[in-house]
Every structure is written in structure tokens, then in C-alpha cells.
Amino acid sequence: MVELGGRAGKSGAFPRRRGYRAVMDVTFTKESGRRYLMTVVRDRGPELAPRHGPGYHDYLPHDAAHFLVEAEARLTGGAFGRIEAGQSNMFWPADNRLLRHQKRRESKRKPSAAEHAQMGRSEDLASVCQVLWELRAGHRSEPPSWFDRVPSENLESGLTERILARLDEFAARWHALPVGHSITLTWPPNNHNRRAGARPAGARR
């Protein structure tokens, strides 16, 4: 399950326990001007600078939809799985002194065939599920022209239904969220030691 809420300690790293799995929190903060900010706190890799995400949406910001798809489909080779593993992906190190080193390091590590396949799977599922969600929620009257080429298993599978349920949950929270408040999603998705909730950005428990 993807947990909504929770945050690492002030050091930016989670306390390690015996048998503890590395985790990552990605916080989506609603900002004025139809923008949203993403902040990553993770166990592995350099600390990352926050960045504004693409594709603002009143219910499902683009990168939040991707996170939920990759988490439910267990796509560890997708964008967020790679970030949790220590890569920067679409982010960059908060310490500018590490930027060149990180770029060199990642340029030497080419994605595997499995990672390429999972990234493509993430794009396909996110595109299809966002359209399905908008149709079901009444935010779209008809599908786009490419939709009739989508394989039927992508439209009617149990995985698709589970993703749509996650999108429903997030969309309701995000739409009701005041500007300046945030929702935090935890990776890996089966980590249950986070409490649900939304709170003002920067707030500490």
C-alpha cells in the first residue's frame, strides 16, 4: 500500500534497524499558480534538491500519477525505483559540488533492458490509467484518438483496477488540499510504518 503522510528525521535519513528495508518519501506540495513541488527524502544516494513537477492537474499531477502506477505495478526499474536506488533521474543533488560527480557516475551506468522495459510500461500504464480515471470521474467526455489501440488487458486487468483505486484516493486528497500543504507517498509501497495524512509543507511531527 502507498502510504500518505510520514517524514524522515531532521537529518534527512531514516533510522536503520536490523532487517530494515531502504525507503524513500516523495512529498508533493501544492503551490499557487497551478504548480507543485516535489521533495525526495531517501536512504541511498546524495540528498536531492526539490524541483517543480511537470503537468499540473487539479486532481492528478503528472509525476504523482507515475509514482502511484509504478508503486502498484512494482516497477522498480521505473523513474521512482531508480531514484530510490540512488540515481538522480529527473532530480539533481542539493549540494552543487556533487553535481558533476553524480552526472559522470550515472552516465557510466546504462539502464538494463529490464529497466527500459519497465520505464516503457510505466509510461503506458500512466497514460491509460489517467484517461480511464478522467472518464470514470466525469472529467473527460471521450477518450483520445489513440485509445482504441490500447490492448484490452491494459483496460480491464486487476492491476488497472488497483491503480485506479490508488488514483481515486490521491485525487480526492489532492483536490481538497489547500495551497502550501502536501501529501507524502512512501516507497517501497509495502512499507507500512507511516501514518496517513496531509499537512502544511515543512511541518514536523
Where are these regions (language model features)?
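Hydrophobic/aromatic-lined pockets within catalytic cores
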Residues: 69, 73, 77
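Metalloprotease/metallohydrolase-associated module, dominated by Zn2+-dependent proteases
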Residues: 24-27, 56-61, 76-82, 88-205
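Active-site recognition of the HExxH zinc-binding catalytic motif
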Residues: 62, 66, 70
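N-terminal amphipathic/basic-hydrophobic helices that include classical n-h-c signal peptides
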Residues: 1-23
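Short amphipathic beta-strand/extended segments with alternating polar/hydrophobic composition
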Residues: 46-55
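Canonical SH2 domain fold
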Residues: 38-40, 50
